[in-house]
Each structure stands twice: as C-alpha cells, then as structure tokens.
Amino acid sequence: MPSPPSPESPATALIALDWGTSSLRAYRLDPAGRTLEQRHSPHGITQLPVAGAEGFVQALQLLAGDWLAAWPRAPLLACGMVGSAQGWREAPYVAVPSDFAGLAGRLVTVPVGSGRTLLIVPGLIEHREGLPNVMRGEETQIAGALALQAVDDLGLIGLPGTHSKWARVADGRVVAFDTYMTGEVYAA
C-alpha cells in the first residue's frame, strides 16, 4: 500500500475510479476537479485478488485504502466494466440519446465498508438495426469533455482504445456513437 497522505495534502473532493477489465485506475480530485494524484493497479474485474465482491473490496483497499482513511467524506465514483454484469454490481445501460442528468439519475450504489458507498456510472447503449452498441467508461470521459467545454454543443468526440469510439453529441447529450476494432487490430 502507498504511504499515507501527509497532513499538508490538498483537500480531496472526489475519489474517481476507472475500473476496466484488466486494470484499475484511481484519481484523487480537488474541488475544482483537478487531479491531485493518480494510481494504477492490475486489479481489473478479471484480475481481482480474490473472487467475488470481497475481491473488489480488497482491490480498492490495496490501491486507495489510505485515501479512504484520510478523506472519509470524499465520495467514491466508478465507471467502466465494474458496472457490467461481470462487475461488482451491474449498472444497467442507459439508451441514447441521453444527457448526463439521465446517467446521474441511474447511478448504482454499492456499500464498500466502514459506512461508505461507491457510486457506479451506467454505460450507454444504442440499438441500431436491431444490434446493440455499448460503451462503459467512455460516457464519463465524454461528460468531462462537455463539462470543460472542450466540445461545442454539436460535435464529434473520438475516444481511442481497444474498442475505439466516435460519439456524436448535441446540446449536452450523447445522441449516437460508433465502435471500431482499431485497438484490437493494432494489438494483434
């Protein structure tokens, strides 16, 4: 476990987790949303220290237990595969078009011990021609880009990764998105 935070550490307003299939990333954010510290571990949802819910608790404690102790009132927010059917607790997909108030209204709460809860952000789903297209984690990145006004009210956001996404946004909502195998092709 990392060394405990010093008493001079800046205030933590949020502990954010990007919990994927093969890794877990944690971010300690200040009240303005700036990253104060970040950490990474190999404990994705398929690489937990032990199986089941206890494995998720252990992975969280191993990576950020000192943060949880130092900032007991800081909310915990997670996105990614942690909210899948194979994750800690399923956060059912929200259909597009969707704004981020719609996502916030569908957060799933998971107790993590010591009276704390973790909020899991649901992913997005689009049904086109009868086939589902999904994202988990990227919706949170899109919300950040929109909050920073990095994208106009009508735009296209590219999200590189194993399953790269191109999301169309309009008026603060994700209206459609496409998924590409680009990352898988390069990794092959």
Question: Where are the regions that the model predicts?
Answer:
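Short acidic-glycine loop/turn motifs at beta-strand connectors
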Residues: 30-34, 114, 168-173
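Short glycine-aspartate micro-motif
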Residues: 14-18, 75-77, 155-159
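Short, well-ordered amphipathic alpha-helical segments that serve as non-catalytic structural scaffolds
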Residues: 53-67
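Gly/Ser/Thr-rich loops at beta-strand to alpha-helix junctions
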Residues: 20-25, 81-85, 159-165
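Short beta-strand-loop/turn "lid" adjacent to the catalytic site in phosphate-handling enzymes
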Residues: 67-135, 171
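Glycine-rich phosphate-binding loop plus the immediately following alpha-helix
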Residues: 46-48, 125-188
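Short glycine-rich, Thr/Ser-proximal phosphate-binding strand/loop in the N-terminal lobe
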Residues: 14-55
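Solvent-exposed alpha-helices and their adjacent loops that cap or buttress functional pockets
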Residues: 6-9, 69, 111-113, 147-152, ...
